[in-house]
Regions:
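N-terminal, polar/Ser/Thr-rich
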Residues: 19-51, 77, 141-147, 167
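A surface-exposed beta-strand-loop module
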Residues: 73-140
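Long, His/Glu/Asp-enriched segments that create or flank divalent metal/ion-associated functional microenvironments
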Residues: 402, 469-551, 556-558
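Surface-exposed beta-strand/loop patches in extracellular or lumenal glycoproteins
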Residues: 55-74, 165, 173-180
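Amphipathic alpha-helical substructures
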Residues: 393-481, 541, 564
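Acidic/His/Gly-enriched intrinsically disordered linker/tail segments
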Residues: 332-402, 461-474
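Zinc-dependent metallopeptidase catalytic helix centered on the HExxH motif
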Residues: 249, 293-359
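Hydrophobic helix-coil surface modules that form long, contiguous segments used
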Residues: 52, 151-155, 163-308, 337
Length: 635
């Protein structure tokens, strides 16, 4: 049987995938598709409401008589046919509402194939919508002015504006934001101009490249900028902006390395906004304005790998976008790949392999937490009726990266050169500005294999890839990549000494001299070791006293220490005070969700007490997920 026939057979077996409709949207984007959005937003801090007016242009894919959009907690005021100026009939279809997805907005308007249909919608947001956080002045660094920011990923743009809230329907976006003086509005586009009125300022932005709605972003606060390169300005509150500019000074180096691996950066500007500590993630790759957590400010640039990751999304995710959240790994696996190419260039192969080892630790932990047979451990999970937040984990990042690394090794070992780099550059060229499914990615790779190797060798490689196991099967992949390196070997020696009860004299100096990834790897291996929950006093003191990990270290190390503390049920008054302080000042879910869960397994009442104290501090997404975690604990 020829290679082409085998490929055709494989494609037929999985062809249904390419026809899958995004299960995370109510919209009929496959019948009539949004192409651009003109948004006008008036920010009211007194009511915590945005009054919005959006003009959405649609392209009809077929004849029809209804446009269906996503909404969640929006009050629709009017829907107007922009061509005629007449009101259109509409309804919020509450009969089909889902807590996880919101309420479909049905607009009754006839259209014909290829027709351009402009619709104007006036509406208001809700003060309680999870896609927007409103911060009172006391929750900011300056303590004088309020602050707000959006988080539209994963399916929360429908809380900011009515739209086809799916990655499958990318849009050109123009934005105006009216805010009270002296506040500044930032957006995921290029700044164009501003108009000052008596008590307000209106800011105008334009995003010329098509983006999915989850990348639409707005932030308003008392903000200042520091230009650190020709294309990067760092924004933050005045009290934080200089520290942030110093921490992220190497940003353009990261961009240049990513450009060398792919092609030129297309977004014009790469700006960074340092958000308040309630921001729930390490970073969010909003185009032209990456959002980052203040927990990255370590003072020594040791945590800027997050910036490298968000920069990588400028190609992986933002230019070439997964069609649905089911293929999230196509965004995050490629972003991890580019991040580790940046790390290889900056720090060397050994550090990049160590980074990959840490990633595999994370992958292992999260697969075991879900259970090896759980659908969410697959790279193609079933998401019908699911809020993607509930399925979210690092599995698409690290399993996706490991899959791509596996493909890279197969291709380059056969080619005896870095052919994979050439193929990936072609991938980012072929699919830029578009959305992509797993099947389109697979087809592209298999076509490239035939192009460079011919049918026989291509068949051997594509068979060795084992697509089904990597993409569809839950749990661990059958192939485990080799990331062995000398840096982790040194860490392993100290882990053995610690667990054997040997002397750790001088380890504090060694630990301080290690690369940040070595420290993270060592602590990860300690936590993963079954003996770590039964440390003797002298062993535990290595962390609590010799290294003093609960004080003065960056958030990665402090978070790991508190995990070790709770594993050993060290819940004396002093330990709990340190933990409570950490939880009250950090809103990043990566760190605080596991700590609340670990504390609840020891003392659920105490965990709930701390959570209730911080209820007004945490982002709504964070609060919902922690409450869901704790609801599963009975003690």
């Amino acid at each position: 049987m020829s290679q082409r026939l085998l490929l055709i057979t494989a494609l037929l077996l999985t062809a249904f995938i390419s026809c899958e409709k995004d299960p995370s949207t109510f919209s009929n984007y496959d019948q009539i598709t949004q192409t651009s959005i003109e948004g006008n937003y008036k920010i009211d801090f007194n009511t915590s409401i945005i009054t919005g007016k959006v003009k959405i242009y649609f392209k009809a894919q077929m004849d029809g008589e209804v446009i269906i959009l996503d909404t969640n907690e929006l009050t629709i005021l009017s829907v107007i046919d922009s061509n005629t100026g007449y009101d259109l009939e509409w309804k919020l279809d509450t009969k089909h509402s889902l807590d996880s997805l919101g309420t479909p907005l049905k607009i009754y308007k006839e259209y014909t194939t290829n027709e351009t249909v402009p619709i104007l919608i006036n509406y208001q947001t809700s003060p309680t919508g999870a896609g927007i956080q409103w911060l009172k002045p006391e929750m900011t660094s300056g303590k004088i002015h309020p602050y707000m920011f959006t988080q539209c990923a994963f399916i929360y743009c429908r809380m900011l504006l009515p739209c086809q809230d799916t990655p499958s329907a990318k849009v050109i976006v123009s934005t105006s934001i009216t805010v009270p003086k002296p506040l500044v509005a930032l957006n995921s586009g290029i700044y164009k101009s501003s108009i000052e009125n008596a008590n307000t300022t209106t800011y105008f932005y334009y995003q010329r490249l098509p983006i999915p709605t989850y990348l639409i972003a707005i932030a308003v606060g008392n903000l200042e900028g520091r230009k650190i390169s020709e294309r990067t300005t760092v924004y933050a509150e005045p009290e934080e902006v200089d520290k942030a500019a110093l921490e992220f000074a190497d940003t353009d180096k990261f961009i240049q390395i990513a450009e060398a691996y792919t092609y030129g950066y297309e977004w014009g500007e790469y700006n960074i906004l340092l958000l308040p500590p309630s921001f729930p993630y390490g970073g969010m790759e909003n185009p032209c304005l990456t959002f980052v957590t203040p927990s990255l400010i370590a003072g020594d640039k040791s945590l800027v790998n997050t910036i490298a990751h968000e920069i990588s999304h400028s190609w992986a995710g933002n230019l070439v976008t997964m069609s649905t959240w089911t293929d999230f790994w196509l965004n995050e696996g490629f972003a991890m790949l580019l991040q580790r190419k940046i790390e290889t260039e900056l720090y060397g192969t050994e550090v990049a392999k160590l980074s990959s080892q840490i990633g595999y630790f994370t992958l292992t932990e999260q697969i075991l937490n879900f259970g090896e047979s759980h659908d969410y451990t697959s790279l193609h999970p079933y998401l019908v009726g699911v809020n993607f937040d509930d399925a979210f984990s690092d599995i698409p990042y690290e399993k996706g990266y490991n899959f791509l690394y596996h493909i890279e090794q197969l291709i380059n070992n056969e080619a005896k050169e870095d052919l994979f780099k050439i193929i990936i550059r072609a991938y980012f060229t072929e699919f830029k500005y578009k959305t992509i499914t797993y099947i389109a990615f697979r087809t592209f790779i298999e076509e490239q294999l035939i192009k460079y190797f011919g049918e026989t060798k291509a068949l051997n490689i594509t068979t060795a890839i084992n697509w089904k196991n990597w993409v569809f099967d839950p749990g661990f992949p059958e192939i485990k990549n080799d990331f062995s390196n000398s840096l982790s070997d040194e860490c392993d020696l100290y882990l053995t000494k610690l667990m054997n009860g040997d002397s750790m004299n001088g380890f504090d100096l060694v630990f301080k001299e290690w690369h940040e990834y070595q420290r993270e790897y060592f602590l990860s291996t300690v936590i993963a070791d079954p003996r770590s929950s039964m440390l003797k006093d002298e062993q535990y003191k290595v962390f609590s006293e010799v290294l003093s990990l609960g004080k003065g270290w960056n958030v990665n190390i402090s978070g790991a220490f508190f995990n070790i503390m709770l594993l050993n049920k060290k819940v004396d008054e002093e330990s709990l005070m340190m933990l409570e302080s950490f939880l009250a000042t950090n809103g990043r879910m990566k760190f605080i969700r596991p700590l609340y869960l670990a504390l609840a397994k020891i003392n659920k009442r105490k965990a709930m007490e701390i959570l209730n104290k911080n209820r007004n501090f945490y982002h709504p997404i964070t609060l919902r997920l922690i409450e869901a975690d704790l609801s599963k604990i009975i003690n």
